A protein has these predicted regions:
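Selective transmembrane helix interface/packing segments
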Residues: 23-379
């Protein structure tokens, strides 16, 4: 009888006081934590800027075009030029708009998006610079995965408020669409991760990433097969469901119903321009990067890869490669698939993905019980 991988047979989650992992960042001075947060958030903003360049280049290659190539070498300064142009635009406010809410709504989307980076580990070790021990994460919450999921759903408030405050029917309809879409797909997104929580016995993102650094060894007669313990191998269905739900949650094509240009002009941000529009724009692309980091850490081993144990920089490089690959699939979907109808969007969530993710949870739980000997088997 084939053996069950050890990763599926560990003890269940224990919630009794203090048995979960405690934050390893508590020994770091608070000023150093703020400095790390400042660096991480600025790196995220720079990454977001060049995500737009990357997307335009990939789409251009798919459509047999050149893409941005005028501003700087290979168009690498195009994001800077776009930002300057955007900030120079006139900031228009509809006459009948609720001005306070209109001002406030885009900021909600941006702040919620960038706050999510706080629980993403860029490595599972500490490094020493100028005699100071520095963590490669801002904070290590023992429920970091729940934090990411919760804040991912909070951004929809900024979209709904922006659509409502614009005094525009297209904007309001876009906001309502976004609310229904997030409610539907946030459930799918969370349930797709339950299998990982069962396997790793933790909700801490650092613990889940560390769990994947242990190789799985399978004996096949005289041969031995060694595979990385990445959860994409033990949870392939969950990974596919997570990816589809993540694309829908971030309002990206082919799930971009809240801003469908052919139906709603520009949806919830139809009336926004200049600086305030940039907050919506920043929020969307930052969410894409955060979700890609989330997927890389939970399913693809995070910083795990050849040579990562020798130098922390190699681990970060592996994490970056995985994020870029995940972002490529975002762009690939946009360049190849048409937008779904709204009834198709909801049907996929409730009639297809929800039953599949529940089956995945049940199968994972049964395998885990069988491996631990707690499930009576007829053989």
């Amino acid at each position: 009888m084939p053996t069950v991988p050890a990763a599926l047979t560990r003890p269940a989650l224990v919630w009794a006081g203090g048995t979960q992992e405690q934050g390893a960042d508590m020994d770091q001075p608070i000023w150093l934590t703020f400095l790390v947060a400042f660096v991480f958030m600025n790196v995220l903003l720079i990454g977001m800027a060049y995500m737009t360049w990357y997307e335009r280049k990939v789409l251009a290659a798919m459509q047999d075009r050149v893409g941005p190539n005028r501003t700087g070498p290979k168009g690498l300064l195009q994001p800077i030029a776009d930002g300057i142009k955007l900030l120079g635009k006139e900031d228009l406010i509809p006459a009948n708009a609720d001005k306070v809410v209109f001002y406030f709504a885009p900021l909600v989307v941006f702040v919620v998006a960038i706050t999510r980076v706080a629980v993403i580990p860029f490595g599972n070790i500490t490094i020493e610079i100028f005699g100071r021990t520095i963590n490669l994460w801002i904070t290590d919450l023992n429920v970091g995965a729940l934090f990411l999921l919760a804040f991912g759903s909070l951004g929809v408030y900024g979209i709904i408020l922006g659509g409502y405050a614009s005094a525009n029917r297209y904007s309001l309809l876009g906001g309502l669409r976004s609310a229904a879409q997030v409610v539907s797909y946030e459930i799918i997104l969370g349930l797709s991760l339950v299998g990982i929580f069962l396997i790793s016995s933790s909700l801490s993102i650092r613990t889940i990433m560390e769990e994947q650094t242990r190789d799985l060894v399978f004996g096949l007669g005289p041969l031995t097969l060694t595979l990385p313990n990445w959860f994409i191998l033990s949870q392939p269905l969950a990974f596919v469901i997570f990816f589809l739900a993540a694309v829908a949650e971030t309002n990206r094509a082919p799930f971009d119903l809240p801003e469908a240009e052919t139906e709603l002009v520009s949806g919830f941000h139809t009336e926004y321009s200049a600086f305030r529009f940039s907050f919506y724009f920043l929020g969307e692309y930052i969410n894409m990067i955060i979700v890609s980091l989330f997927a890389a850490v939970l399913f693809l081993g995070g910083t795990d890869g050849p040579g990562a144990e020798r130098f922390w920089g190699i681990g970060i490089l592996w994490l970056l490669v995985k994020v870029i690959i995940f972002l490529f699939f975002y762009i690939w979907l946009r360049g190849t698939l048409p937008r779904f109808r709204y009834d198709q969007l909801m049907g996929i969530a409730w009639k297809v993905l929800l039953p599949l993710v529940l089956v995945n949870i049940m199968v994972t739980a049964l395998i885990r019980l069988a491996g631990s000997g707690e499930l009576p088997l007829p053989f």
